[in-house]
Regions:
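Generic structural signal for well-ordered beta-strand positions
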Residues: 43, 49, 66, 157, ...
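Acidic-histidine catalytic/liganding microenvironments
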Residues: 31, 78-79, 141
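Conserved ATP-binding/catalytic segment of the ANL
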Residues: 2-60
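Adenylate-forming
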Residues: 13, 47-74, 103-121, 140-144
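Residue-level signal for inorganic ion chemistry
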Residues: 46, 75, 95, 147, ...
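C-terminal boundary motif of the adenylate-forming
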Residues: 39, 77-102
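Conserved adenylate-forming
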Residues: 1-3, 11, 90-94, 101-108
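Conserved C-terminal "lid"/linker of ANL adenylate-forming enzymes
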Residues: 83, 91, 129-168
Length: 168
C-alpha cells in the first residue's frame, strides 16, 4: 500500500498545455508522465482512492497529512449544510460552513416560539453540534477546533469549485 501523487501516462493523456511550455514543464515529466496534482492511496488490493488535491493538503502540528476534502465531505453530509471549506488558521483547523438558514429556522421554529430573538444563538448551537459530529467521524489529528458560519455562498470557479485561496 502506498500514498502519493497520482501520475498518468498513455495515448489518452494530454501531452501539455497549448503554447504554454512553462506550465507544461510543471505537470509533464521528461519521460511523459502527467502529474495530476491528486493525492492517491493504493489499498492492499491495489485499488486507487483519491484523498484530495496535493495543493490543498494541510500538514498538522505533528507532521501528519490532513486532507480537507475528507473533512468537508463529512461536514456536507450533516443536515442543512449547503457547502463547507476547511482551512488552517493560526495552527488550528477551522471549518467555514454555509448553511440553509431557512431550513434551520424552520426546524427550530417547531421547538421555539419567538425564533427571531434567538436566531443567532440557534446558529451557534447548530455549529457546535456540527463540530462535535464531525470530530466523532474523523481521526484525532483532523479534529476541528472551530466551525464558523459563512453567511454567503463561497465564490466559485467556472467549474463550480470553491476558490480556496480567497479564504486563507
Amino acid at each position: 500500500t502506498g500514498e502519493g501523487e497520482v501520475w498518468a501516462k498513455g495515448d489518452n493523456v494530454m501531452k501539455g498545455y497549448y503554447l504554454e511550455p512553462e506550465m507544461t514543464a510543471e505537470v509533464i515529466t521528461p519521460d511523459g508522465w502527467f502529474r495530476t496534482g491528486d493525492l492517491g492511496h493504493l489499498d492492499k488490493d491495489n485499488y486507487l482512492s483519491i484523498r484530495g488535491r496535493l495543493k490543498n493538503m494541510i500538514v498538522g502540528s505533528s507532521g501528519e497529512n490532513i486532507y480537507p476534502e475528507e473533512i468537508e465531505s463529512v461536514i456536507n453530509d450533516f443536515g442543512h449544510v449547503i457547502e463547507s471549506l476547511v482551512v488552517q488558521q493560526k495552527g488550528k483547523l477551522v471549518a467555514m460552513v454555509h448553511v440553509n438558514i431557512e431550513e434551520l429556522q424552520a426546524k427550530y421554529q417547531q421547538m421555539k416560539k419567538d425564533i427571531s430573538d434567538q436566531a443567532e444563538l440557534l446558529v451557534e448551537e447548530y455549529l457546535e453540534e456540527l463540530r462535535r459530529y464531525v470530530n466523532s467521524k474523523v481521526n484525532k489529528y483532523s479534529q476541528l477546533q472551530l466551525v464558523v458560519y459563512q453567511p454567503e455562498p463561497f465564490q466559485k470557479t467556472a467549474t463550480l469549485k470553491i476558490k480556496r485561496f480567497l479564504y486563507y
